[in-house]
Amino acid sequence: MSATLQPYLEAVRHTLQAALCLEQFSSQVVERHNKPEVEVQTSKELLMTPVVVARNKQERVLIEPSVNSVRISIAIKQSDEIEKILCHKFTRFMCQRADNFFVLRRKPLPGYDISFLITASHTEAMFKHKLVDFLLHFMQEIDKEISEMKLSLNARARVSAEEFLKRFN
């Protein structure tokens, strides 16, 4: 783990722990409805100040808390064109399977690669610290996965190029 990753993850952890103090809050517009206020944004007084935790210009997390939900959007580091393509394919693959991940949103916010929506119902059904651990583990693993895919892709490209060039010798 790099020297800047640990403080970044700790800052995200503490911010998420503070933001996940959620409670059930019925809709002020429609009776017997409970919608995530961070998504519908009907009342400004129910939304809290969004927080951006950034490791660098490309790698950042946007945490948008409200009274009954939190939306977490993650921008994944993409240093070159290969990483951009791999990241796009990987996040698209994950978003297509959002039904299997209860807190994953199907569509990320503009400027971010993947988004999660945690509601008060999720915090009642699951442990808050486990949700935070899952998000931090996800952030670590997605970076590792993309790096491993890039190494594998480069190795396959090298083998293909060698096989192609053998024909000319």
From Swiss-Prot:
Belongs to the ARPC4 family. The gene is arx-6. Its main location: cytoplasm. It comes from Caenorhabditis elegans. Disruption phenotype: RNAi-mediated knockdown suppresses the memory retention defects of the msi-1 os1 loss of function mutant. Keywords: Actin-binding, Cytoplasm, Cytoskeleton. Functions as actin-binding component of the Arp2/3 complex which is involved in regulation of actin polymerization and together with an activating nucleation-promoting factor (NPF) mediates the formation of branched actin networks. Seems to contact the mother actin filament. Plays a role in time-dependent memory loss and the retention of conditioned behavior over time. The keyword Zinc-finger does not apply. Pfam families: ARPC4. It is found in: Cytoplasm, Cytoskeleton. This is Probable actin-related protein 2/3 complex subunit 4. Component of the Arp2/3 complex, at least composed of arx-1, arx-2, arx-4 and arx-6. GO terms for cellular component: Arp2/3 protein complex; cytoplasm. One of its GO terms (molecular function) is actin filament binding. It comes from the Eukaryota. Coiled coil: none annotated. The lineage of its organism: Eukaryota, Metazoa, Ecdysozoa, Nematoda, Chromadorea. One of its GO terms (biological process) is morphogenesis of embryonic epithelium. InterPro entries: ARPC2/4 (IPR034666), ARPC4 (IPR008384).
